[in-house]
């Protein structure tokens, strides 16, 4: 009996690329999934290597122009957005590797989100409010930070993970797990403990959830 291959989209959003904690944790999760009998097909979207276009007036105008009226230039402008949305639609599992920058997400990730949140494509409005259109997916947020924003006194400063959860829910993805790798700048012992705990959580996700 064969099991259908699951498609995994890994979105890396650290500008430090190969020296990124969140990226390394995403790679660790991929390695754990590869050790399972279930087959996975991985797509890596590294926003440091291929940044999403910055949302400007030309993009805004192109997004709200009917498809049949798009000029050749506008077709080129909307091409990255359509590619990103197709990747979301075809993925079974979406992994967002997200370092915290100034209490929120990176500029790279914000530009990507501006490209995928499109009315009629990833969400729509009706009488009862918005409805997400990217349904039936699982998502994992890997949140890394130099400080520890998991404590009672600090968690209110974390604008990263609540925002990402909201965006995912908004476009229809409600099955979301978050793995934290916080305290990486608080000394070697704290960093080692956080890394070990995150790896354990990722192993558990790979074995029991994904």
Language model features: what each stretch is:
Residues 2-98, 103-114, 118, 200-210:
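N-terminal beta1-alpha1-beta2 submodule of the flavodoxin-like/Rossmannoid cofactor-binding fold
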């Amino acid at each position: 009996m064969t099991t259908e291959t699951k498609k995994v989209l890994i979105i890396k959003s650290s500008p430090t690329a190969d020296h990124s904690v969140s990226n390394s944790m995403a790679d660790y999760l991929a390695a754990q999934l590869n050790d399972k009998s279930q087959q996975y097909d991985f797509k890596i979207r590294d926003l440091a290597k291929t940044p999403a276009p910055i949302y400007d007036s030309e993009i805004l105008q192109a997004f709200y122009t009917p498809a049949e009226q798009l000029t050749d230039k506008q077709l080129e402008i909307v091409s990255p957005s359509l590619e990103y949305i197709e990747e979301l639609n075809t993925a079974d599992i979406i992994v967002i590797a997200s370092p915290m920058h100034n209490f929120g997400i990176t500029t790279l990730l914000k530009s990507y989100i501006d490209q995928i949140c499109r009315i009629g494509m990833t969400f729509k409005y009706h009488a009862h409010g918005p409805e997400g259109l990217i349904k039936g997916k699982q998502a994992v947020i890997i949140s890394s930070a130099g400080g520890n924003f998991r404590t009672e006194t600090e968690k209110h400063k974390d604008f990263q993970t609540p925002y990402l959860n909201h965006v995912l829910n908004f476009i229809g993805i409600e099955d979301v797990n978050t793995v934290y790798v916080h305290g990486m700048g608080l000394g070697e012992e704290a960093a080692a403990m956080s890394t070990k705990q995150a790896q354990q959580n990722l192993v558990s996700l790979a074995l029991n959830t994904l």
